[in-house]
Amino acid sequence: MLITRIIKREKSSKYDVFIDGEYAFTCDAETFFMLGIEEGKEITSEQYKYYVNYIEAKEAKNHAFRLLSRKMLTEKQLADKLKLKGFSEEAIGEAVSKAKEYDYVNDENYAKFFVEEKMQSLYSRRRIYYELLKRGVEKEIIEKVLESIYPHEKEVEVIRQIVEKKKNSHREIQKLKKYLYTNGFEIENIEKALNLT
């Protein structure tokens, strides 16, 4: 395999590389010089695969860091977004590992932030639990974070806040019980909160 042509893009630090007369890949200037790519250079198919895998892994990492600079994500959410972008499993694995290494992705920190935020929005423990499960956070992490930040006693307080907003009559109380139960609050906590108000 022969690198037959290299075109530097205008107004960009990217290079288009052609092998045996056909377009092969695009890379940035840093990668271009680091890999020692030059016109007329003979490369093996193993070198070609290495170049392509290296470039894809670097692009996946860069994309992951851009995503994480805008929004906190779980490992699963990050991997899913990279998969949607078309990156290979290997490149996704490298990107997620690098993000974890720099502590840009940390499911426990994500869970703590999520629980704090949703508690303020008067979510039940159960609803938060299932929302975090959907986002790929492990059960053990969710349980640990819920116990430390949102114990059952706090859920009773949250129920009281909801009750204060909605209670007027017996009929309203019954509707409220049903509302609270369908939103994931435990029946024992509902009864406690209603008896204490």
From Swiss-Prot:
Signal peptide: none annotated. Keywords: Cytoplasm. It holds the Pfam family RecX_HTH2. The keyword Glycosyltransferase does not apply. Its main location: cytoplasm. GO terms for cellular component: cytoplasm. It comes from the Bacteria. InterPro entries: RecX_HTH_1st, RecX_HTH_2nd, Regulatory_RecX, WH-like_DNA-bd_sf. GO terms for biological process: regulation of DNA repair. It is found in: Cytoplasm. Modulates RecA activity. HAMAP family: RecX. Belongs to the RecX family. This is Regulatory protein RecX. It comes from Caldanaerobacter subterraneus subsp. tengcongensis (strain DSM 15242 / JCM 11007 / NBRC 100824 / MB4). The lineage of its organism: Bacteria, Bacillati, Bacillota, Clostridia, Thermoanaerobacterales. The gene is recX.
